[in-house]
Amino acid sequence: MDPQDCTCAAGDSCSCAGSCKCKNCRCRSCRKSCCSCCPAGCNNCAKGCVCKEPASSKCSCCH
């Protein structure tokens, strides 16, 4: 299981799996599955992208 909170610095690797469930994950190794909270209806995020920031009109996995 992934830790609930990654403490690694931005760009560093960490123990997160590809499904990254960390609240504050900034690691390059697992950022691909983490994104800002997406607007309602973002299909990409609904497919497993972990919400890690307050909701916004844009996110890293749906443009």
Swiss-Prot record:
Cited PROSITE patterns: METALLOTHIONEIN_VRT
Positions that bind a divalent metal cation 5: C35, C37, C38, C51
Chain segments annotated as coiled-coil in the UniProt record: none
Binding site for a divalent metal cation 3: C16, C20, C25, C30
Molecular function in Gene Ontology: metal ion binding; zinc ion binding
UniProt keyword terms in alphabetical order: Metal-binding, Metal-thiolate cluster, Zinc
Binding site for a divalent metal cation 1: C6, C8, C22, C25
Free-text comment about domains: Class I metallothioneins contain 2 metal-binding domains: four divalent ions are chelated within cluster A of the alpha domain and are coordinated via cysteinyl thiolate bridges to 11 cysteine ligands. Cluster B, the corresponding region within the beta domain, can ligate three divalent ions to 9 cysteines.
PANTHER family: METALLOTHIONEIN, METALLOTHIONEIN-1X
Protein name (Swiss-Prot/TrEMBL): Metallothionein
Native species: Gallus gallus
